[in-house]
């Protein structure tokens, strides 16, 4: 496939990211290992960029990722929609309900306070995006027709 840069006026998106979006669970001021409740967010290095571009500069953005087709995946899609990022390029992967086929990634992050640094712990084994192949996404359409 030949990628030709086109004028912005011919492109649907200003920026598109490709990568894993995880459900981020934040124990607030507490520790992961002793928390009884968490605040949920979406997050992922590549996704955070397009969300920031959308929120800060009102750019048209999208994310290319894959989710297990279950309630957690739908929650993450909703978080992405709330961030203003287009979700139409998400690949929904069949799941068996127990994570053997695929699952959605989790990230636990403690906030840093004073001299205590932030602490993170990710649970990313067997995630939908890690099971995805290039054939799961129509890159000719994404980079050809959409720009």
Language model regions located:
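A general structural signal for well-ordered alpha-helical segments in protein cores
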Residues: 15, 46-50, 73, 105
């Amino acid at each position: 496939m030949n990628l030709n840069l086109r004028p912005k006026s011919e492109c649907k998106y200003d920026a598109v990211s490709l990568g894993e979006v995880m459900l981020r669970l934040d124990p607030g001021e507490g520790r992961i290992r002793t928390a009884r409740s968490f605040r949920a967010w979406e997050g992922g290095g590549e996704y955070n960029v397009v969300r920031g571009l959308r929120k800060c500069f009102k750019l048209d953005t999208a994310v290319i990722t894959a989710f297990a087709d279950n309630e957690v995946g739908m929650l993450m899609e909703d978080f992405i929609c709330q961030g203003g990022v287009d979700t139409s390029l998400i690949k929904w992967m069949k799941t068996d309900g127990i994570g053997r086929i695929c699952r959605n990634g989790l990230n636990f992050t403690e906030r840093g306070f004073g001299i205590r640094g932030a602490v993170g712990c990710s649970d990313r084994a067997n995630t939908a995006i890690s099971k995805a192949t290039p054939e799961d996404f129509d890159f000719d359409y994404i980079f050809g027709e959409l720009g």
